[in-house]
Amino acid sequence: MNKLSKNMSKVSPNLDPIVLLIDLDNTIIGNIIPQINEYYLIKDINKKLKKINKKQIRYNTKLLHEELEKYIIRPKFSKFVRNINKYDNIELFIYTASENSWANYIIKQIEKVINYKFNRPIFTRNNLVINEKGKYKKSINVVKPLIIKALKKKKKYNLENIKYIALIDNLRNVLIEKDKLIKCPEFNYRHQINYLRMIPEDILKKHYIIVEDRFNLKHSNNLYDFYEKYYQVLNSDYKLTKNNPNYLNDKYWFNFSLVLKQNLSNMSFTNLIKILRQIK
């Protein structure tokens, strides 16, 4: 057992798991709306091509991986998960409000880039609850039974409950169990792309209406009119990157790792959460 694991045992002599649920958007990654738009646009077009027995567009995952690594994944997050591997009983789960199929897809791509696999299941919009005001919320009590079931399969824990659990999220009011929330600063770096970059020209000429539907544009009479409307949308989207410089030196996950290492072995989990909430 390495030094960090020995320190961990001072907090959890029975090797109780410490479960960190981590939000996806604006916590692990920045503003990924451009990539979501591209992903669903390709799906829309391929659905049409499949119906008419035409060759479908191949989504360029290599390009996505490059952009995840360089721009979209929050700085130092990959180092954070490598540091987590040094601890015997810290368990990472994803808890996002994103739609289920997209969340599972993009998380698998993130895992390939950072060379780390999160615990399963991945908690998504399907695992949200509706509060008394009719708003969707995350709830530790909802996902906890599924976490216990998953950890029991590892056969390294003997547990009926989880003593140490928290959610790291950039939103203040997202969690029902507010005492378990570690709010982090928002990471909103946006890597803007041309949404048409993967679409062959011959396919675009025949199916540009699908692009218009995706971006809620009025149908054009010809390709020229389409391009005029499309580039107005694209230019507006590029303007949304104006705040990117504010996020270039983000150190949240670096500081989180440092605080965790310095304090995990010498304070209660409740006090540790209080310290982690102070990280900027």
Regions found by a protein language model. Give the residues of each.
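Intrinsically disordered, low-complexity acidic Ser/Thr-rich regulatory segments
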Residues: 13, 56-72, 238-248
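Conserved phosphoryl-transfer catalytic core
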Residues: 37-67
